[in-house]
Amino acid sequence: MGLSTRDILDMGSLSRKDISLVLDTARSMKEISLRPVKKVPTLRGKTVVSFFYEPSTRTKVSFDVAAKRLSADSISLSVATSSMTKGETLLDTVKNLERMSPDVVVIRHSSAGVPHMLARHVSVPVINAGDGMHAHPSQALLDMMTVQEKKGRIEGLRLAIIGDIARSRVARSNVEGFLKMGASVVLAAPPTMIPVGVETFGADVTHNVDEAIAGADVIMMLRIQKERAAAFLFSTVREYARTYGLTANRLKNAKKDVLIMHPGPVNRGVEIAPEVADGPYSVILDQVENGVAVRMALFYLVMGGQRDAGD
């Protein structure tokens, strides 16, 4: 049995069964990355076209590596060298490229809703690699994979997300995903970084970081999204780090088996101290590693795969 949806647009488009299928498939995919030859012919003859309208390191490279590990051809379109610089719309660009018969489109865009718009107008699967402040489903899935891998479960755990919640698509997707899989979530941030309508998220909210940390099984730190804010939302960076940053001293109040996560890029010394980011509780690099496995699973499943692709 495959996914119940053609497109991966947000966590709302995935059922609990879909999420479990992705995570189970990703575990099989991770084994491929541990082999001496990290490649299988599963998607040979398939083509992935990627559009990244925002800067990206981990996500862009991860999708590219994922496609190539499954033997798919991966083509990344540079906006700067495309006809969009001549006035062509994104929709026209994609519809023209669709006639070249790609098998899946991956898109990151600064405007919320763009992947949904494309999905309505093209006949191939669309994977959202992040749209504005709205959603980042593959990030939430890799985060859930990492927690499940380290804790053996997601259900019943407590996730604390600390930082710029208002402007974070990662926060929104993780809240929805973890709640759907039976975890509880607490959001901690200054009032200027809590979104309007947060009461609809289904998560607890506090402005006290130490309170959020104390009961958490998993702590996810978020950077300040300066590129999405009209002005800095705290008095000074130093004051923000002192009040909301995760330090070794603050971590003493956490559970002894707590996991520390960060979607990256990390601003060391601001939202998280270097010794915490590099410390024994950190699974930040595990998240990066699992990102490849999750995106391999997504490519495989949206192209019609049912489960095991390890051969």
Swiss-Prot record:
Binding residues annotated for carbamoyl phosphate, in chain numbering: R58, T59, R108, H136, Q139, G264, P265
Pathway named in the protein's UniProt entry: Pyrimidine metabolism; UMP biosynthesis via de novo pathway; (S)-dihydroorotate from bicarbonate: step 2/3
Coiled-coil regions listed: none
GO molecular function: amino acid binding; aspartate carbamoyltransferase activity
Residue ranges crossing the lipid bilayer per the database entry: none
Reaction it catalyzes: carbamoyl phosphate + L-aspartate = N-carbamoyl-L-aspartate + phosphate + H(+)
Signal sequence bounds: none
Top-level class of the enzyme under EC nomenclature: transferase
SUPFAM superfamilies, alphabetized: Aspartate/ornithine carbamoyltransferase
Residues reported in the UniProt entry to bind L-aspartate: K86, R169, R223
Alphabetical list of PROSITE patterns matching this protein: CARBAMOYLTRANSFERASE
Keywords, sorted A to Z: Pyrimidine biosynthesis, Transferase
One GO CC term on file: cytosol
Annotated InterPro entries: Asp/Orn_carbamoyltranf_P-bd, Asp/Orn_carbamoylTrfase, Asp/Orn_carbamoylTrfase_sf, Asp_carbamoyltransf, Asp_carbamoyltransf_Asp/Orn-bd
Quaternary state and interactors: Heterododecamer (2C3:3R2) of six catalytic PyrB chains organized as two trimers (C3), and six regulatory PyrI chains organized as three dimers (R2).
Family from the record: Belongs to the aspartate/ornithine carbamoyltransferase superfamily. ATCase family.
Protein function: Catalyzes the condensation of carbamoyl phosphate and aspartate to form carbamoyl aspartate and inorganic phosphate, the committed step in the de novo pyrimidine nucleotide biosynthesis pathway.
Name under which the protein is recorded: Aspartate carbamoyltransferase catalytic subunit
Organism: Desulfosudis oleivorans (strain DSM 6200 / JCM 39069 / Hxd3)
Gene: pyrB
